[in-house]
Amino acid sequence: MLISDRDIRTQIDSGRIVLDPFEPSMVQPSSVDVRIDKLFRLFDNHKYAHIDPAEEQPELTRLVEVAADEPFILHPGEFVLGSTYEAVTLPDDVAARLEGKSSLGRLGLLTHSTAGFIDPGFSGHVTLELSNMATLPIKLWPGSKIGQLCFFQLSSPAEHPYGSGAYGNRYQGQRGPTASRSHQNFHRTEI
C-alpha cells in the first residue's frame, strides 16, 4: 500500500523512515521530493572495448564533483550517475520507489533507467541513472529537486531485509553515485 503524506510524516517523526537531511516542505501528497547532490560519475568510454556486467571494470567511470553553486551540464544523449543529496534509511517493512519529477521529464531528463526500486532495510544515498533525451544540454543544479520517493508498506516485515546479507548488500551505506557492482553476483543460466 502506498503511504500518504500524513503517514510519511508519522514514519519520519518516529524515526522508522530516515531522510538525512529532512526538509518538511519536501513532503508531497504521497511522496517526498529529493534533491541532487554535487557528485557525478562519468563514463570513460575509451578505456574498454565494451561494457561487460560479468567483469569488474574499475576504470569504466570516474567521480567528479561540481561546486555547490555551479551546474553539472548533461549533454544530449549522455548518461551519467548522480545521487540524491538525502541519505535514505528504510525499516524492514517499508520499500520505496524513486520516480522522476514531471517538470524535468518534460524537459527530456530521465532520472533512472531501471533501478527505481529501493528494498526494505536499505540505508544510503540513492544512485540516480541520469539521461538527457533532449536535443539541448540540461543544467543540473546541486541541491535542486530531481525526483521523489514513494513509500510502500509491506504486508509483513521482510524476512531478509537489504543489508542482512542473505540476498547481498552491495550498495548498503553507499555515499554518492556508486558504480555498478554487477560482477559481484553475476548470474547466467546456461542455455
Curated annotation (Swiss-Prot):
Here the segments flagged for biased composition (Polar residues) are 171-183
Q: Which family does it belong to?
A: Belongs to the dCTP deaminase family.
Q: Where is this region: Disordered?
A: 165-191
Subunit structure as annotated in this protein's UniProt entry: Homotrimer.
Residues noted as binding dCTP in the record, renumbered to the chain:
101-106, 119, 127-129, 148, 162, 174
Q: What are the record keywords, sorted?
A: Hydrolase, Nucleotide metabolism, Nucleotide-binding
Q: Which domain of life is it from?
A: Bacteria
Annotated protein name in UniProt:
dCTP deaminase, dUMP-forming
State the function annotated in the UniProt record.
Bifunctional enzyme that catalyzes both the deamination of dCTP to dUTP and the hydrolysis of dUTP to dUMP without releasing the toxic dUTP intermediate.
Uppermost EC category: hydrolase
Describe the reaction catalysed, as an equation. Answer: dCTP + 2 H2O = dUMP + NH4(+) + diphosphate
Residues annotated as site: Important for bifunctional activity: 116-117
> Using the chain's own numbering, where are the disulfide bonds?
none
Active-site residues (renumbered): 129
One biological process GO term for this chain? dUMP biosynthetic process
The pathway this protein participates in, as annotated, is:
Pyrimidine metabolism; dUMP biosynthesis; dUMP from dCTP: step 1/1
Its Enzyme Commission number(s) read 3.5.4.30
Q: What InterPro entries does the entry give? A: dCTP_deaminase (IPR011962), dUTPase-like_sf (IPR036157), dUTPase_trimeric (IPR033704)
Reply yes or no: does the keyword Hydrolase apply.
yes
What would be an example GO MF term here? dCTP deaminase (dUMP-forming) activity
